[in-house]
Amino acid sequence: MVYWIIIMSTFVLDQLTKARAEKFFVDSPVNLLGGILSLTYVQNRGGAFSILEGKRRFFIIVSIILILFLCYMIFKSTSNLYKFSFSLIVGGAIGNLFDRIVKGYVVDFIDIKVIPVFNLADFFITGGVLLLTFLILKEGGEELFLKKKP
């Protein structure tokens, strides 16, 4: 149950921040931290780093498959940390999928200058992938499906 709350919370937070970006940053970006960080509005019609721009249908199909697979992994995994990492990825993926279906593009707005502009969904996906990678490297993936001891 808690993992579905994490998924919904990340989705809602992502959508709320994107709505604010659309309202306030379209014509007037905000520079913060001496210009190191900017809040600006960007329509991303590709994937991460704007790769495969214009391949909307591809990203929708891949996102749906990934979301379904990771929801299955949440259900099957016995490790709370794995479930948490999957939940972050799913919540972020749903946020970007929603944008692609409803708007035809993903709203990005966080600009740190040294990396491409991104959004909170991307942040959650990246955090979930980093945690998952760390867990697999640390544990070898054994914790994914081990049965809990009675």
UniProtKB/Swiss-Prot annotation:
Which segments of the protein form a coiled coil according to its record? Answer: none
Its chief place of residence is membrane
Annotated Gene Ontology MF terms? aspartic-type endopeptidase activity
Cellular localization per UniProt:
Cell membrane
InterPro entries, per the entry: Peptidase_A8
Q: In which pathway does it act?
A: Protein modification; lipoprotein biosynthesis (signal peptide cleavage)
EC number(s) recorded for this UniProt protein: 3.4.23.36
**Any Gene Ontology biological process:** proteolysis
Arranged from A to Z, the UniProt key words for this protein are: Aspartyl protease, Cell membrane, Hydrolase, Membrane, Protease, Transmembrane, Transmembrane helix
Quickly give the catalysed reaction.
Answer: Release of signal peptides from bacterial membrane prolipoproteins. Hydrolyzes -Xaa-Yaa-Zaa-|-(S,diacylglyceryl)Cys-, in which Xaa is hydrophobic (preferably Leu), and Yaa (Ala or Ser) and Zaa (Gly or Ala) have small, neutral side chains
User: What is the role of the protein in this entry?
Assistant: This protein specifically catalyzes the removal of signal peptides from prolipoproteins.
- List the transmembrane segments: 58-78, 85-107, 117-137
Query: What is this entry's stated membrane topology?
Result: Multi-pass membrane protein
Protein name stated in the entry: Lipoprotein signal peptidase
